[in-house]
Amino acid sequence: EIMIKLFGEGIKDLKYYWFREYELDGIPLIISRTGWSSEFGYEIFLRDGTRGNDLYERIMAAGKEHGLKPGHTSSIRRIEGAMLSYHADADLDTNPFELGLDRLVNLNNEVNFIGKEALKKIKHEGIKRKQVGLELDCEPLKGPNTTFWSIYKGEERIGKVTSAVYSPRLKKNIALAMVKINHSEIGNSLKINIDNKEINSKIIEKPFYDPKKKIASS
């Protein structure tokens, strides 16, 4: 409804993962039918960096009656959908194979690209760690984690929690984590250190909610 108010009924014709050029009160934009929350959404890309404040004010004004508020990278739906946050769940030291994104990498293509040889080596040698989903057995988290939490199997530190939050929808604490590959099996029980307290957890399937992205693609 907010997007229709801003851009008219035609915005509804934009299909999932399609994009189109728009203008809003003279502000040049590109809008795509994608999002970062696993909900039905849009992304608005500003083509004139000097108009950022103008765009923000117009969007917030249009959304006021609908209760629109700013969100951030630790939003519950982002983590429920297992969508990655750069600098948290992924950084310069991670690779697509660790993150379960190898379906997006074609190493057999004749075209060269930066990192191709490095990725070939990683694929040949195998990964040493893997991103997993966790269910944390503790009281509902008061907010998302602001630091990485260490993960242990016995006395061995085997990884870290990168994103964690309490999901009211699922009625449990969920987290994304990077752990050593030999401890990454579904159902594996692990210990997490949160503020010097030992918390039980187990590895579960991810995404935690709507794994087929039916909501986002509807």
Language-model features, listed with the residues they occupy:
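Conserved, structured C-terminal
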Residues: 1-218
